Amino acid sequence: MNIHEYQGKEIFRSMGVAVPNGSVAYTPEEAVEVAKGLKEGVYVVKAQIHAGGRGKAGGVKIAKSLDEVESYAKELLGKVLVTHQTGPEGKEVKRLLVEEGCDIKKEYYLGFVLDRATDSVVLMGSEEGGTEIEEVAEATPEKIFKEVIDPVVGLMPYQARRLAFNINIPKESVNKAVKIMLGLYDVFMKKDASIIEINPLVTTGDGEVLALDAKINFDANALFRQKDVMELRDLDEEDPKEIEASKYDLSYIALDGNIGCMVNGAGLAMATMDTINHFGGNPANFLDVGGGATKEKVTEAFKIILGDEKVEGIFVNIFGGIMKCDVIAEGVVAAAKELELTIPLVVRLEGTNVDQGKEILGNSGLAITPASTMAEGAQKIVELVKEAK
């Protein structure tokens, strides 16, 4: 789960991580009122959407007066911001963060991520702040430094100091940087985060160290014990189909293609998408119905897939272990009848109760194309979609 920058900074502030003074605004008038409560001088007006690259897309403005704050707020609110992370459709700006500007001396990158290679949380840092860290990793990987954190003892102060020295934070600011790193690790562990990034972390002309950005992603599997985090969820920033899927414990991610996929198991779902691509198709979604799908759940899955107007065909690929093929077949038939399905549908069933499942499909009277293997099914749905055009 993602949250906005201003929400992340509120969490940082509560954990002792230094951030600029500021607050959220939903109207130009509110933006001016926020600015009035800040130190006079330079104000920063930042669009709040769940995507990076806002600065390059014109979503961050520097104002030198209250009139400019109001002008920029009017310009940004309601604007559709297109960044490299939003896709061409962009995202509408519905709120702003207005905060004090600062005298930036140097920018750095700081992040905490889960490293599956070491089964540990890793602290990452670079003196190339303000730049996409992926670009730094590709062009100058030697400028990225890492500290693997022992899960038993946590982040040790000496590790934070070592990283601070490695990324060339001035000696007089190291202790403040170390305090921020220890505070961020506290946030990461206590809030069940999956990633925390500050880009940039800055040193200022008056010797302060501040987090000018705040990106926090949370582990969705731990949200049941993070009620305060759940309250920060902004449904306006999420795909309505993904929201609907979460109500039925379906794992759904919208993609750009035209072939809908319904699969059980994340690994099989990814393999299915790869196979569709191999035969010249383009998946419209990732949808994992899980191992405990019911007839009703399958019907809802179909509704979600068909809620995407780009979908021109559906491939159902099920391997029945805990999941029973006859239950899937009943759900597929019920959904196809209820929704009056008119686009091509290919179904591949294998595993528990597969014969009963195939019999249900065969006796349904519907135009369902069976497949014996994943490759056959993927090839058939790609061909049928092309023929239907």
Curated annotation (Swiss-Prot):
Cofactors named for this entry: Mg(2+)
UniProt feature coiled coil, ranges: none
Amino-acid positions noted as binding substrate in the UniProt annotation, renumbered to this chain: 264, 321-323
GO CC entries: cytosol; succinate-CoA ligase complex
Pathway linked to the protein: Carbohydrate metabolism; tricarboxylic acid cycle; succinate from succinyl-CoA (ligase route): step 1/1
One Gene Ontology term of the molecular function aspect: succinate-CoA ligase (ADP-forming) activity
GO terms for biological process, alphabetical: succinyl-CoA metabolic process; tricarboxylic acid cycle
Catalytic activity: succinate + ATP + CoA = succinyl-CoA + ADP + phosphate; GTP + succinate + CoA = succinyl-CoA + GDP + phosphate
InterPro entries: ATP-grasp, ATP-grasp_succ-CoA_synth-type, ATP_grasp_subdomain_1, Succ-CoA_synthase_bsu_CS, SUCC_ACL_C, Succ_CoA_ligase-like_bsu, Succinyl-CoA_synth-like
EC code(s) of this entry: 6.2.1.5
ATP-grasp domain segment(s): 9-244
Pfam families: ATP-grasp_2, Ligase_CoA
Cofactor note: Binds 1 Mg(2+) ion per subunit.
First-tier enzyme category under EC: ligase
Keywords annotated in UniProt: ATP-binding, Ligase, Magnesium, Metal-binding, Nucleotide-binding, Tricarboxylic acid cycle
Binding-site list for Mg(2+): 199, 213
Amino acids binding ATP: 46, 53-55, 99, 102, 107
Family: Belongs to the succinate/malate CoA ligase beta subunit family.
Subunit structure: Heterotetramer of two alpha and two beta subunits.
Known role: Succinyl-CoA synthetase functions in the citric acid cycle (TCA), coupling the hydrolysis of succinyl-CoA to the synthesis of either ATP or GTP and thus represents the only step of substrate-level phosphorylation in the TCA. The beta subunit provides nucleotide specificity of the enzyme and binds the substrate succinate, while the binding sites for coenzyme A and phosphate are found in the alpha subunit.
HAMAP family in the cross-refs: Succ_CoA_beta
Protein name: Succinate--CoA ligase [ADP-forming] subunit beta
